Amino acid sequence: MGRQFAGICGARGSLYGCVVCNTYLTCSKELTSKAFTGSTGPATLFKRAWNVVYGRCEHRKMTTGWHTVRDVFCVTCNQKLGWMYEMAVSESQTYKETQVIIENANFEKIAGAIKDPLGEDRQEAPPAPNLEMSRYPLEAEKKSRPQYRTVSVSSSSSAEC
């Protein structure tokens, strides 16, 4: 059986997956910071993650203050990966809200850089349209138009509709 994933959802750059089952979790474009510490050691803050399930909301005292968090688990193997910040009490910590901490021991790089299938990373400008050429020549366009005749209708008081 191959890797399970619900979707890559516009993932670009390096892909990261669960260390146990290699299920796709997130990508390097979603990375916010590597300067975090989890319960098992270093951790990484990502804007979002896919193929995860969330536990119940809990209030936890962390090194930066009180936070409302949910544990995050791999959808395939149920490995605990880290947590998601639901709410921060301190105003200076609100940037973490809705972001996901994944402990470095629980994920690994699963692929090199991938090519953007939609071409959204393209830096060059799109080609300018050629306005001199048209789909139909002007004369052919005139000939293909339906010709309508105008008919005048006089109304009389004795005419019935």
From Swiss-Prot:
Which intervals carry biased composition (Low complexity)?
Answer: 151-161
Which residue spans adopt a coiled-coil conformation according to this UniProt entry? none
Q: Which residues bind Zn(2+)?
A: 18, 21, 74, 77
Record carries keyword Zinc: yes
Q: Which InterPro entries match?
A: Yippee (IPR034751), Yippee/Mis18/Cereblon (IPR004910), Yippee_fam (IPR039058)
Q: What's in the keyword line of the UniProt record?
A: Metal-binding, Zinc
Residue span of region Disordered: 117-161
What is the top-level taxon of the source organism?
A: Eukaryota
Boundaries of every Yippee domain copy:
14-111
* Keyword Manganese in record: no
Annotated GO molecular function terms are: metal ion binding
Q: Name one GO cellular component term.
A: ubiquitin ligase complex
Pfam families the record matches: Yippee-Mis18
Q: Give the matching PANTHER family.
A: PROTEIN YIPPEE-LIKE CG15309-RELATED (PTHR13848)
**Protein's recorded name:** Protein yippee-like B0546.4
